[in-house]
Amino acid sequence: MASRARLVAQGVAIGLVALLFILLAWSLLNDKGGDLAKKANRGDRPVAPSFTLERLDDDGELDLSSLRGKAVVVNFWASWCAPCKEEAPVLEEIWAKGKQRDLVVVGLDAKDFRPDARRFMRRFGITFPVVYDGPGGTTDDYGVTGFPETFVIDREGRVVAAFVGAVNGEDERVRLQSAIDDALST
């Protein structure tokens, strides 16, 4: 009798663990980013958190507020992030086409090592400005939940749209271009 009760208890325990695993997987798959991303994608246009960070592509620092009057695409990435590698050429293309239209792409490397980030930049031929947020303070301010995440900011410093995950599929690229056009029109 005791072995039957033990089998039932083990079955219940396994069932609970499986249920928790399923709930965790569902939660991760349906995560659409932090509050800032959710507000932007609802159409609220929250003010983009300001930052002043060390540049990896050049000397000095980059202050987001110095870009006021331009549309800005801020892409959060890390050298160890596989989807970031797929997305890098897309962002470089957007930068090459958009800089004549008052569009600035800013790469924000976080939770990474500087030498690894610079190798990533060389490997993928990144020419847009890149800043370093080593421990992730700015990443936390934006509510970034994973890499990559991309925020489109209008000329007035408000977040027009946010993209959780790589922007490399056709649908995502169309949505991103639409958000950029919207940001440039303000």
PLM features: residue spans?
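N-terminal targeting signals for export/organelle localization
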Residues: M1-S50, E54, T186
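Short pre-active-site segment immediately N-terminal to redox-active cysteine/selenocysteine motifs
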Residues: K70-V72, W77-W80, G146
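A short beta-strand-turn-helix
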Residues: S50-V72
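Active-site loop/turn elements of alpha/beta-hydrolase fold enzymes
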Residues: A78, A110, D133-P135
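Short, internal strand/loop/helix patches
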Residues: V106, R118-E156
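Conserved redox-active cysteine motifs that mediate thiol-disulfide chemistry
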Residues: F76-E93
